[in-house]
Amino acid sequence: MKSRFLFALVCAAAFFSGRSLAAPSGPELGLQTWTCRNMTFDQVVDFATKHGLKQIEFIAAHLDPAAPRAESLRKKAILDAHGLTAYSFGVNRPGLDKEENRKLFEFAKLMGMKVIAVEPQDLRAWDNLEELVKEYDIKLAIHNHNLDSVYGNPATVEKVLAHRDHRIGVCLDIGWITAAGFDAAKVFHDYGDRVYDMHLKDKEIVTNDGKSVAVDTEIGKGNANYAGLFAEIKKSGWTGVMAIETDSKAFAENPSRLVDEARVFFNAQTANVKTVATR
C-alpha cells in the first residue's frame, strides 16, 4: 500500500512539473533610441531601465558600428549588467561596397544581434547584402519612411522580398506606413511571415498651408489602424519587438510621458493577444 502511495506521488510530481508556465506569447514592447536622441548612451540605459524596456534598437549616436571593438564590448557589458538587450540597430543605409557592409554584420555579430534595420538607397545593394545575410545568418529588416522614400510603397518592398533569402524581411514603421496612405493592418497581413521588427509609432495627417503633413501623436491617438493591426498580430502569432519611436522633437525633449502612455496602450491592445502555455 505504501509503495503504491509513493508511486502515485511520483507520478503526480512528474505530471505537474511538466505543466510549467511558458513565457507569454505575443509581441514584446521595446525602445528605438531615436526616441532618446537627446540623451547619452548612459542616459538611455537609465531611461530604459526605469521604464522597464529590455529590448532596445539603437541608433549610431548611442551604439556606433564604427566604434572600436573595445568600446562596443564595454557598452555591451553595461547593457548585460542592466538586463538589457541590443536586439537591433539602425536605420542603416548600406551601399554597394560589400566589404563596407560587412562591418555592419561584424558589429551585429559582436553585439549578439539577430536583425539589422536597413534602408539601402540603391536597390543594387541587395545583391551583396543577400550574400552577407547567408554568410552571417543575420536578418535584415527593410524600414519604410514616407511615400517619396525608396521603400515608402509596400509594393517596392514586396518586389525586393520576392526573390531574396527569407532572412531578408521588414521593419514595419507603423507611423510612416500610415502617413504614406496605407492600412498598417493590411500591410502587415500582406507581408506574411517576413515582418521581423516594428516601430511603434503613430501619426495623423493635418493640413498646413494647404499641404498635407504627417504629425506625430501619442501612440493610439493618430490615424494608424492599431485595432486591425493587433487583430492581425493575434491571428498570426507574431512574437517580435514593437519598439517605441517618435520623430517629434517635442516628444523627444522628454519622452517619459510618451513611453508611459505607449505602455498603457500596448498592454491594453495585447491583453487578448498574449496567451500562456500550460504544457
Language-model segments: which ranges?
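Solvent-exposed loop/turn segments at secondary-structure junctions
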Residues: 34-38, 61-65, 91-96, 121-123, ...
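Residue-level preference for nonpolar/small residues embedded in alpha-helices
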Residues: 40, 71, 100, 124-125, ...
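Active-site acidic/histidine proton-transfer and metal-coordination neighborhood
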Residues: 43, 62, 78-169, 179, ...
